[in-house]
């Protein structure tokens, strides 16, 4: 359950410019996700039932997006290490199943994340990103969601 060294390198190179401005990019991604998939906001206690305008104005937006991008950074940094990825994916899936979040919500993320990264002029790595999110989706399915 990991990426090849070449795939991990591609993901790392495309992620670097995104993570370099993680606060603004994290907020932008989360808002884009909620605009495209409004129901996903309901999986976050701070955003449940709120409009995009309310979420954008929320002081919690930065906290949530920062946690998400920090966690994603851990996956990126360990993407080629099968042992670490297996443990991280298992823990991640267990936590998210506990929140009621399943593979469908991460399929939504998977469907738009490569284009989001590309929109920031990051090097393309669509197939590698799809594989990384595929590992997350598979872990959630294995955990029952």
Curated annotation (Swiss-Prot):
GO terms for cellular component: extracellular region; hemoglobin complex. Pfam families: Globin. Residues 2-145 form the Globin domain. InterPro entries: Erythrocruorin (IPR002336), Globin (IPR000971), Globin-like_sf (IPR009050), Globin/Proto (IPR012292), Globin_lamprey/hagfish (IPR013314), Mb-like_M (IPR044399). PROSITE patterns: GLOBIN (PS01033). Keywords: Acetylation, Heme, Iron, Metal-binding, Muscle protein, Oxygen transport, Transport. The keyword Heme applies. One of its GO terms (molecular function) is iron ion binding. The modification N-acetylserine is found at residue 2. The keyword Mitochondrion does not apply. Heme b binds at residue 96. Disulfide bonds: none annotated. Monomer. Belongs to the globin family. This molluscan globin lacks one of the heme-binding histidine residues found in most other globins. This is Globin. It comes from Aplysia kurodai (Kuroda's sea hare). The lineage of its organism: Eukaryota, Metazoa, Spiralia, Lophotrochozoa, Mollusca.
């Amino acid at each position: 359950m990991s990426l090849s060294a070449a795939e991990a390198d591609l993901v790392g190179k495309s992620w670097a410019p995104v993570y370099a401005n993680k606060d603004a990019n994290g907020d932008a991604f989360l808002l884009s996700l909620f605009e495209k998939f409004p129901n996903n906001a309901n999986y976050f206690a701070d955003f449940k039932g709120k409009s995009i305008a309310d979420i954008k104005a929320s002081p919690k937006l930065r906290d949530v997006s920062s946690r998400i991008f920090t966690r994603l950074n851990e996956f990126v940094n360990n993407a080629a290490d099968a042992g670490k990825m297996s443990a991280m994916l298992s823990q991640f899936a267990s936590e998210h199943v506990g929140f009621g979040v399943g593979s469908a919500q991460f399929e939504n993320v998977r469907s738009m994340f490569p284009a989001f990264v590309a929109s920031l002029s990051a090097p393309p790595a669509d197939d590698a990103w799809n594989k990384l999110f595929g590992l997350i989706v598979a872990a959630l399915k294995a955990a029952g969601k």
